[in-house]
Amino acid sequence: MSLHVTLRFTVALAAGLLFGFGLALSEMINPIRVLSFLNVASGHWNPSLLFVLGSALAVAFPGMALQRRLKRPLLDECFHLPSKKVIDRRIVFGSAIFGTGWGLTGLCPGPAIASLSTGLGPVLLFVAAMAAGMIIHDRIVVRCLS
């Protein structure tokens, strides 16, 4: 394995470990914590997860500024940036479905996968159903649009 490939795997491993640890430490893997953050209207809103958002922005903004100055990333051939900038029906509908699921369960993909470490049955079922939903999307929606 080349040094370049080893570095890419090492960076991916370190980023994944940091992300998973941060999800657990911030309690993003706790659906009750997430639902209390999303529960703005009840008078029992818990804004603590705003620190997660703030930390992401504190890293992303300088990273985006650096990206604009670089010709290519250090460990890849090019930057993989979204090219679609139009908000269409698919984005709106998909966002509504995602938001409904997140609001009902308090879990979204990253925290759900990190929650697998708990070994809890409902989390295992949620992740399996989430994967099934993605497979159904790929088999039906992507094929219809192709």
From Swiss-Prot:
Belongs to the TsuA/YedE (TC 9.B.102) family. It comes from Xylella fastidiosa (strain 9a5c). InterPro entries: DUF6691. The chain crosses the membrane at residues 9-29, 46-66, 91-111, 116-136. GO terms for cellular component: plasma membrane. It is found in: Cell inner membrane. The lineage of its organism: Bacteria, Pseudomonadati, Pseudomonadota, Gammaproteobacteria, Lysobacterales. Induction: Repressed by BigR. Part of an operon that comprises bigR, blh, XF_0764 and XF_0766. Keywords: Cell inner membrane, Cell membrane, Membrane, Transmembrane, Transmembrane helix, Transport. The keyword Cytoplasm does not apply. It is a multi-pass membrane protein. This is Probable transporter XF_0765.
